[in-house]
Amino acid sequence: MVNRKWMYIFIQFLLVSSIRSDDDVFEDDEEEVTKGSDDKEEFVPSLFVAPKLSDKSTPNFFDYFPVGSKIGLTWIKSLAKKDDVDSDIAKYNGEWSIGAPTKVSIEGDLGLIVKTKARHHAIAAKLNTPFAFDANTFVVQYDIKFEEGQECGGGYLKLLSEGAEKDLANFQDKTAYTIMFGPDKCGATGKVHLIFRYKNPINGTISEYHANQPTTIGSTYWDDHNTHLFTLVVKPTGEYSVSVDGKSLYYGNMMSDVTPALTPPKQIFDETDLKPVDWDERENIEDESAVKPDDWDENEPQSVVDEAATKPYDWNEEENELIADPEAKKPQDWDEDMDGSWEAPLIDNPACKGLSGCGTWKAPTIKNPKYKGKWIRPKISNPAFKGKWTARLIDNPNYFEPKPFAGLAPITAVGIEMWTMSENILFDNILITSSEEDSSDVAKQTFYVKQKEEYRLAAATGNGNGFFQQIIDATNEKPWLWAVYILCVLLPLVAIGVFCFGKQSKPTPNFAKKSDAYSADDDRVPNLVDDDEEEIIGDEEDDVNQPGPSGSQSNPEPQDEEENAEQQSANSSQSSAAEEEDDEHVVPENEPVKPTEEFAKKSPKNTGGAKRRTARRGD
């Protein structure tokens, strides 16, 4: 019990400490808001510093959109049309520009911006050097900002296969790509695509393989209007990892964590194998020899009127069960030409309240004991049943044992091809390389600086997220955090409630016996009345002891000193005799306890103190 109490005290201490820390956070937030409102300074954007890679770095592509960048130089806008769609939406007529975001946090930091919504957009750029999937790790990284949020649309990159760089002006949805990577959202939740297009070396077909990923990523990346960093790393072993803002989102291996499986089955069903004409797959058939019984009447209804039923004695057939509401009034805007004749709504008839019913009484219906329904022949086992037919298995002529990078075509260009219902989507710092160190270095020089400045801008304009909002945003990315919050808040509260309001242990009475030996107070009557009743009983004792038939009090006659001395001596001798008699009746621990009744017969009766003992147990 002591350990439990200490545990509850410790939990309460942790909870109070957390609340105090939260209060400190909120106080700091309030101070910042107050300071911002009273002493608000104009936000001054920091100056953009161009990222620099080491001299040893040789990225395949890197564009941070420096000042002076224009559409048509590095990035070529598509002039193609989508196939198999209406002509009015077939064109890639979405507008692009290179510029600053609507809210500038870093002066001179530009990006590639989607300027229109509800249109098809396509734009592409040629890599400085092609990326061949051999022994090098593949890394693609970029940051994206949905300034207006995202209702429905993408924000992903397509790493175009070799040959696409020759005609970027005709880049479209059917242009071959090797990897597609990036965010996509339509509705309340989104996903971060990772799709590989892998070539079968046996038959030359190229198929899409989707990486397995979380089903509930949330909507924070699209709806918080902040910049987010997306990074993909694919290693020659087939291992891949997807991270957002430097934190792992999901990971796996091309050989085992894609859908469909990259390795084809060794055996397949023979498509030329056809089911024989006489193959019977019916396990049970109707018994043709069965005959409907003569007493089977299909015309009998399922229920019939209960002829034994009688009308209840309090059934009132003169009253209707429902009547027009007498308090209802026709609406003032009621037009009988348009709405028809107005009728008051029906309500329960108050005259029928408490009765079995009103209106015309009808006998209830019961199940018809003669009902059998439609007769059907029973089922019997099919003697010609051969089982479920399946085509025979043959060796898969297109089977191969894949190697992670063997079926990935070289990448020569990067493109953005998407439909979106939102505008002002900004792409920036697009990097394709074989060096994870380069991607980390670029992120430190670009994204993390931008993230810090965006937070500073939000705080200066009063748009920063509070403590609770950050908690909720975290659950969008990781819904399982709700369980953690409940465990951290609800369980301590329950523990504190049990500790504070749980069942209390009963106090040990101060008159409890410490041994089984008989004691002189075993025959005393327990306290059965409260203090107020004790006072009343005490007063009654005083009244009984008062002399005089009338109950009036008179002053006692004075006694001389000799009489007082004799009285005191007599009282002393009586007290000594009583104590000796009590000692005689005390049972030693090694002797059996005498019955209470026997002891009571031998004990002297004290009639004057009976009421007093009844009033208080311990006296």
From Swiss-Prot:
Glycosylated residues in this chain: 203, 571
Source organism, top-level taxon: Eukaryota
Record PTM text: Glycosylation is important for its biological activity.
Biased segments, Basic residues type: 610-619
Ranges of biased composition (kind: Basic and acidic residues): 585-601
Span list, region 4 X approximate repeats: 270-337, 340-397
Chief place where the protein resides: endoplasmic reticulum
Pfam family, any one: Calreticulin
Sequence repeats: 270-282, 287-299, 306-318, 325-337, 340-350, 359-369, 373-383, 387-397
Region P domain (Extended arm), annotated ranges: 268-401
Residue span of region Disordered: 538-619
Positions with a binding annotation for an alpha-D-glucoside: 156, 158, 177, 184, 417
Family: Belongs to the calreticulin family.
Protein name from the UniProt record: Calnexin
